[in-house]
From Swiss-Prot:
It comes from Danio rerio. The gene is dis3l. Catalytic component of the RNA exosome complex which has 3'->5' exoribonuclease activity and participates in a multitude of cellular RNA processing and degradation events. This is DIS3-like exonuclease 1. It is found in: Cytoplasm. PROSITE patterns: RIBONUCLEASE_II (PS01175). It catalyses: Exonucleolytic cleavage in the 3'- to 5'-direction to yield nucleoside 5'-phosphates. Keywords: Cytoplasm, Exonuclease, Exosome, Hydrolase, Magnesium, Nuclease, RNA-binding. GO terms for molecular function: 3'-5'-RNA exonuclease activity; exoribonuclease II activity; RNA binding. Residues 1001-1017 have a biased composition (Basic and acidic residues). Pfam families: OB_Dis3, RNB, Rrp44_CSD1, Rrp44_S1. It comes from the Eukaryota. InterPro entries: Dis3_CSD2, NA-bd_OB-fold, RNase_II/R, RNase_II/R_CS, RNR_Ribonuclease, Rrp44_CSD1, RRP44_S1. Component of the RNA exosome complex. Residues 459-807 form the RNB domain.
Length: 1057
């Protein structure tokens, strides 16, 4: 080993250039990462494939500017040097560096890191007077030469660089190392890879135009690091995340300050950032530092409805009381991602630029500003949705600069809109690769899968001793949970069992299938399709606990006192099960109700044998219901919340067109199953936290901020109810009492308002969170995790592995594999939280898409389906917000139009526009015209007309128009008593199976012809079904207008178990 010194010029935390001298050690033996290695290097982890024609070594500039091209999976045999890696780490942002790390860690990319600066024959010290850029390029070239010689010339090496001097100097130095530009490389080696060529031209053009010609500054410069550091410590500056109000994207954004970063005790709300100038080039989601403006410059949030998302027009006298207002002084971390945009109409482009090469494109997301891109394909991209990426936003530019990536498709087409939703939510779900499918077990008629005898002997066999059954939606194929309940000998104890598909038996940790599942983190359910987390051979077959077949399971078995139902003991472990009955919810409920119904599994039996089996099944269902009621009562005592919601699903005709949107009726058996799943999740959480106190994956639900309950409290007060929000128990009791016997919808709306106040339930590692914060507020449980849906949630896969490790520790056995440390688990938890949020948003957006499709082809003035009953649940300066229970919609209803006319109501309740005025109060709004006055109160029923508001650049939206101040005559009476519906919190537990099985039901009824890809990957491309399942959390997110007056869009959050 050789010791020397290395001189670095780094940026300090205060933004200064610092000269650093570090000890530098070099040695002969450094892993090369190639499968062609001739020197027996100790290569650990990924190695480069031998099935490539060459290896490619990009220099620092290429890695810095053209990383997107290197991320294409078609490019193989990439050797990233330590020189390039560390330079990017020090000179580019964290997001760019994390992308580079992900590229190296992902086994699907044929790319390795070569520590060239530790290899004594590869590293070259910096020469006197040599620029840092030249030194870096020379080091990368030396690494390429060393690599070629190390492999004994078995593989040509191509170094790509944008340094023309380097190309001239090195191109003829070594016959086995070729030094060429990025463009020459793509033309010579990848002439047919159009995606790479498009990216190159777009990025290169943007880089050429980045140099500014001395234009005047539009925005103030960001503050230097040393000023920021001192200001944050003193409390002058506040750090937080910028959230843009999509309804007034040019004017309103809010910063939710993080923790106690500010010492300003007056800050009990978010900080308003008013106008683009004060936003100072920050984009929605950026981590920013802000400075509060003087108090006399504080402004209030807009209290009026805006006509359409992103609508901008003057709104006098419609602001709330002044609130803390600030300006952005620095952007700590960019949240840039891929954006879907639409080019403006051709005539508008001509006015922007004569040559139509520099164009302002409009993002699909209202919260993102217009982006300037350069393209020579402007005419061809008309009416297309395209993806762009941001490159820079200089202080001299009104808009950020970006570059074109690729075309998604024609605007308005179903497939394009679905792909837009996926891109906007950063969801990447390609078909499972051949390598991943090769890891899967085979189960065909010719080669049926069989259980392994050693595996069978190591498990507890419940096949003959337990009556196991599943309760799922009709047609469910991916059954990941089953139940059992029986009276133990002696009659003094019951045994309750929850049996979950043993996914971890088939998905080995670190396998390609496991890595893909980790990347996806969840199964994505859209309105017309799903993207599975696992291949179909597992999710719909070998991991599905179907009736009448032997399956591996992970089980939790409780012994309960037969009278008190208190837990006497609990057992965790791997089992063998055979489900006797595959029931659906309606069938199970009918059996419990004493109705004469047909159980398919009992059809072959006759007489007394059939009666005996039916009696056993009924007894099990009744006992299970009794146990579930007890479990729910126990949680209720602790303060579990019952938050109301509406589920809606679509009915289709034979041509797969939506014919109706139908609310789904809740059943007690739904909650029975959910309570058992919650109980299993809770006990597994206790077990893994006790065994691994510093690195167990749990799920907590933090208590909401009290100010978020203001809307709920004020609305309830207007109707004569008092809501106590000091604890979850107090809130639950208050909501239970807030019942209007004349209108059950009042209670349901109050529960929805409570949902909007809730924070998100999140995964976390126990070593990263104080124990007092483990509590799940909504479920009223001290410990909670997810264990019961490993087919669809990667969090459950992690928990299964932790549980088995805990069981092994109990037996004084070492876990079969090393478990993730706290840091790794916390990073993974954050990844899963982000993906879950993306899945939720994408499902909500796809439902909205299909709701618009349902109403789009209907004449709102003649079709009675476009007229519906609505309930007022919030009052604004120029209208009110209404809920349409028939379709599960929320939206804005305007009482004042652009011309200043207001709604006038005649004697029959019909509405028309007339000159007049509005007066807004906390619980009502009064319209006054020459014909009289009319008052609209909170919780009044009115009649609205639903129509579609088309948009060229954004998603279509639904418009609610008031046509009568009276309830709609066709509205159906509420059949459900207030407070008696399914809990929105337990909804998530059963929602997974419902969504998937509804698709299976549709498929069975129609028996569509599937393409080869659909059969293999079970990821449909054609619109073969529409499933619109809406739970309480999604109803909150569907609110079309509430975000105008909340601090930020994220304040309308979900509450899920």
């Amino acid at each position: 080993m050789i010791k020397t010194e290395k001189i670095l010029h780094l940026n300090s935390s205060k933004g200064r250039k610092v000269r650093v001298v570090r000890e530098h050690y070099m040695r002969e033996q450094v892993p090369c990462g190639s499968s062609l290695c001739q020197a027996d290097c100790q290569n650990v982890g990924k190695v480069l494939s031998r099935d490539v024609t060459h290896y490619v070594v990009p220099d620092v500039g290429v890695v810095r500017d053209f990383l997107e091209i290197l991320e294409l999976r078609e490019l193989q045999g990439i050797v990233l040097t330590q020189t390039a890696y560390q330079t990017v780490q020090h000179t580019r942002g964290r997001r760019h560096y994390n992308r580079l790390r992900s590229l190296l860690k992902d086994p699907r990319h044929d790319c390795v890191l070569f520590a060239n600066e530790f290899q004594q024959y590869s590293y070259c010290p910096r020469e006197k007077g040599e620029s840092q850029d030249k030194w870096h390029t020379r080091n990368v070239y030396n690494a390429a030469v060393w690599y070629y010689n190390h492999l004994a010339g078995l593989q040509p090496v191509v170094m790509i660089t944008e340094d023309r001097d380097a190309i001239s100097e090195f191109s003829a130095s070594n016959s086995g190392v070729f030094v060429i530009s990025t463009q020459e490389y793509l033309l010579g080696f990848w002439p047919d890879l159009q995606a790479a060529h498009d990216l190159y031209h777009s990025i290169a053009q943007t880089l050429q135009e980045r140099e500014n010609d001395g234009a005047e500054k539009v925005y103030t410069e960001h503050l230097p690091a040393e000023v920021l550091e001192a200001g944050i410590k003193s409390g002058r500056y506040i750090q937080g995340i910028l959230s843009v109000n999509k309804h007034r994207a040019q004017h309103e954004a809010f910063v939710r300050y993080e923790g106690s970063a500010s010492k300003n005790t007056e800050l009990n709300s978010d900080v308003l950032i008013n106008g683009a100038k004060h936003r100072n080039r920050a984009v929605h989601g950026d981590v920013v530092v802000i400075e509060l403006l003087p108090r006399n410059e504080w402004k209030g949030r807009t209290m009026a409805l805006t006509e359409g998302q992103g609508e901008e027009r003057p709104l006098e006298d419609t602001q709330s009381q002044p609130m803390p207002t600030g300006r952005v002084v620095e952007i700590l971390q960019r949240n840039w991602r891929d954006y879907v945009v639409t080019l403006p109409p051709f005539e508008e482009m001509q006015s922007q630029s004569r040559n139509s090469q520099k164009i302002l494109v409009v993002p699909w997301d209202y919260r993102i500003p217009k982006i300037r891109i350069s393209t020579q394909q402007a005419e061809a991209l008309q009416d297309q949705r395209v993806i762009v990426r941001l490159d820079s936003w200089e202080s001299t530019s009104v808009y950020p600069n970006g570059h074109f990536v690729r075309v998604l498709g024609k605007s308005g087409e179903l497939e394009t809109e679905i792909q837009t939703i996926l891109v906007e939510n950063c969801i990447h779900v390609p078909p499972f690769s051949e390598a991943q499918l090769r890891e899967m077990p085979v189960n065909t008629e010719e080669n049926p899968w069989q259980m392994d005898s050693n595996e069978v002997s190591s498990r507890r066999d419940l096949r003959d001793s337990h009556l196991v059954f599943s309760i799922d939606p009709k047609g469910c194929e991916d059954v990941d949970d089953t139940l059992s309940v029986r009276t133990l000998p002696g009659g003094k104890r019951l045994e309750l069992g929850v049996h979950i598909a043993d996914v971890t038996h088939f998905v080995r940790e670190g396998s390609l299938t496991d890595l893909e599942a980790r990347s996806r983190a969840t199964t994505y359910y859209l309105a017309d399709r799903r993207y599975d987390m696992l291949p179909a051979v597992l999710s719909a077959d070998l991991c599905s606990l179907l009736g009448g077949v032997d399956r591996y399971a992970m089980s939790v078995l409780w012994e309960l006192d037969a009278e008190t139902l208190e837990v006497c003991s609990v057992w965790f472990g791997r089992t063998l099960i055979r489900s006797s009955y595959q029931l659906h919810y309606e069938l199970a409920q009918s059996l419990l109700n004493g109705e004469e119904v047909e159980v398919p599994e009992l059809n072959p039996l006759k007489g007394s044998q059939r009666d005996q089996k039916m009696s056993e099944l009924l007894q099990a269902l009744e006992t299970l219901t009794r146990v579930a009621r007890h479990l729910r009562a126990q949680r209720d005592k602790g303060g579990a919340l019952e938050l109301e919601g509406v589920e809606v699903r679509a009915q289709l005709d034979e041509e797969k067109n939506i014919t109706a949107l139908v609310p789904k009726q809740p059943l007690e058996v739904h909650e029975t199953v959910a309570e058992c799943m919650i109980y299993a999740n809770h006990w597994v959480a206790r077990k893994i936290q006790e065994s691994f106190p510093h690195h167990a994956l749990l799920r907590h639900h933090p208590p909401p901020k009290q100010e978020f309950f203001n809307h709920l409290i004020d609305s309830a007060k207007a109707h004569g109810f008092s809501i106590d929000t000091r604890s979850n128990r107090a809130l639950a009791d208050s909501l239970e009492r807030a019942v209007d016997p004349r209108d059950p919808l009042v209670n349901r709306l109050l529960r929805m308002m409570a949902t909007q106040a809730m924070s998100n339930a999140l995964y976390f590692s126990t070593g990263s969170c104080p124990e007092e914060q483990y509590y799940h507020y909504g479920l009223a449980l001290a410990r909670y995790t997810h264990f019961t849906s490993p087919i669809r949630r990667y969090a459950d896969v992690i928990v299964h592995r932790l549980l088995m490790a805990a069981v092994q520790l109990e037996k004084d056995e070492s876990p079969s594999k090393a478990l993730a440390c706290n840091k790794e688990l916390e990073e993974l938890a954050q990844h899963i939280n982000n993906k879950n949020r993306a899945a939720q948003h994408s499902q909500k957006q796809s439902i909205e898409l299909f709701q618009c499709m349902y109403f789009r082809d209907k004449d709102s003035h003649t079709d009675e389906r476009c007229v519906a009953d609505a309930v007022i649940y919030a009052v604004r300066a120029n209208g009110f917000l209404a809920f349409v229970p028939q379709y599960g919609l929320k939206g804005a209803v305007y009482l004042k139009d652009r011309e200043g006319q207001v709604i006038s109501v005649d004697g029959d309740g019909k509405c028309e526009w007339k000159p007049g005025t509005l007066q807004k109060y906390s619980d009502k709004i009064i319209t006054s015209t020459s014909t009289g006055t009319h008052t609209f109160y909170l919780f009044n029923h009115v009649t609205v007309r639903i129509s579609v508001e088309p948009s060229r650049c954004h998603a279509d939206s639904l418009n609610l128009e008031l046509i009568s101040n009276k309830p709609h005559c066709a509205v159906q009476p509420e059949s459900q008593p207030a407070g008696g519906g399914r809990s929105g919190l337990v909804e998530e537990v059963v929602r997974w199976a419902e969504e998937a099985s509804l698709q299976a039901e549709e498929q069975r009824g129609r028996k569509p012809k599937l393409s080869k890809e659909e059969k293999q990957f079970r990821q449909s491309k054609t619109p073969n079904l529409y499933v619109l399942l809406q739970e309480i959390s999604e109803l909150a997110l569907m609110d079309l207008s509430i975000c105008q007056i909340t601090n930020s869009e994220e304040q309308t959050c979900t509450v899920s178990s």
